[in-house]
Curated annotation (Swiss-Prot):
Belongs to the radical SAM superfamily. RlmN family. Specifically methylates position 2 of adenine 2503 in 23S rRNA and position 2 of adenine 37 in tRNAs. It is found in: Cytoplasm. Disulfide bonds join 125-363. HAMAP family: RNA_methyltr_RlmN. The gene is rlmN. One of its GO terms (cellular component) is cytoplasm. Coiled coil: none annotated. Binds 1 [4Fe-4S] cluster. The cluster is coordinated with 3 cysteines and an exchangeable S-adenosyl-L-methionine. It catalyses: adenosine(2503) in 23S rRNA + 2 reduced [2Fe-2S]-[ferredoxin] + 2 S-adenosyl-L-methionine = 2-methyladenosine(2503) in 23S rRNA + 5'-deoxyadenosine + L-methionine + 2 oxidized [2Fe-2S]-[ferredoxin] + S-adenosyl-L-homocysteine; adenosine(37) in tRNA + 2 reduced [2Fe-2S]-[ferredoxin] + 2 S-adenosyl-L-methionine = 2-methyladenosine(37) in tRNA + 5'-deoxyadenosine + L-methionine + 2 oxidized [2Fe-2S]-[ferredoxin] + S-adenosyl-L-homocysteine. It holds the Pfam family RlmN_N. S-adenosyl-L-methionine binds at residues 187-188, 221, 244-246, 320. This is Probable dual-specificity RNA methyltransferase RlmN. Its EC number is 2.1.1.192.
Amino acid sequence: MTSLPLTPVNLDAPARRAAMPPRHLADLDLAGRQALVAELGEPRFRARQVSTHYFGRLVRDSGQMTDLPAAAREKLTDRLLPTLLTPVRELTCDDGATHKALWRLHDGSLVESVLMGYPDRVTACLSSQAGCGMACPFCATGQAGLTRNLSTAEIVDQAVYLAGVAASGAVAGSPPRLSRVVFMGMGEPLANYNRVVAAIRRLVAPAPEGLGLSQRHVTVSTVGLVPAIRRLASEDLSVTLALSLHAPDDGLRDELVPVNQRWKVSEVLETAWEYAARTGRRVSIEYAMIKDVNDQPWRADLLGRLLAGKLAHVNLIPLNPTPGSRWDASPKPVEREFVRRLRDAGVSTTVRDTRGREIDGACGQLAAAEGDEIVGPGAP
């Protein structure tokens, strides 16, 4: 492997100060919604009515909330149900089991969401930022850079929309109910900490306050922001932590995951074990298999030694190369040998089911393709 120049990551730089979207009911807890409704001169129970439509019936269009008086509906729409996500493109593949949505936000930013159906569950993959500032060189989103953080409601609205798709029966061969959420779309979730945690609380709160998902069915991915992982451990949330490791040694991880230049593999893993001990939740170790880069047998053995005896599971990810990238997925025999060595070390290991390749399913690819169509290849 030819060494890459190390890419510094400025973690202290805030996301670009773009105008945030208008306030939405998903930005507020039920008490906050009731207070806002009262300010509008409406009875407080209207907040519960609107929340029941949105979270309980998955209705995002106030025009369908016909039990509300027309005058009240107009006022509440302006203040509680502004349009946050405008569909740009919606694609389906895997015989109807995978649905991908590309959204334009109020400021023109593009974000993606994916719905994946399985025989026993339906999973939504949500974006937490427009773009990403972590600069991982094999990731389409990381190469695009960070535009801004998403609001709590922009995150939640993705889930509510996808839950509606599932409820419609459109996901072939799957139950008609969203059951899991993974924060593995565009962005580094823990770099948008407050809004992501608020979104999780909406997702797991029972209807009409929230979507009613199980905390244990929510997964938060991170490249390893150590202080934020420790903070998440103190939130009294039983969500799964997914650590995007991608290399077991600092020399390579400094290149693949530039944040490793601040928090090394040993510190990141130690913090992950602290999270597991505090929450009782097994940590998922995410590892993209990149041909001739991080797939050598000795790296499998090193990873096995680091994880042996820990409350962890390795999720190997066949790389979905971005257009024009010099990165490629590891050959299947190499992948199988990597799995064998990890399992021989006593480490629980699976290979992620690849989804959405024919529709630019990897994080950031659809937005990148749309951006090229809008502004032209090579535009800044």
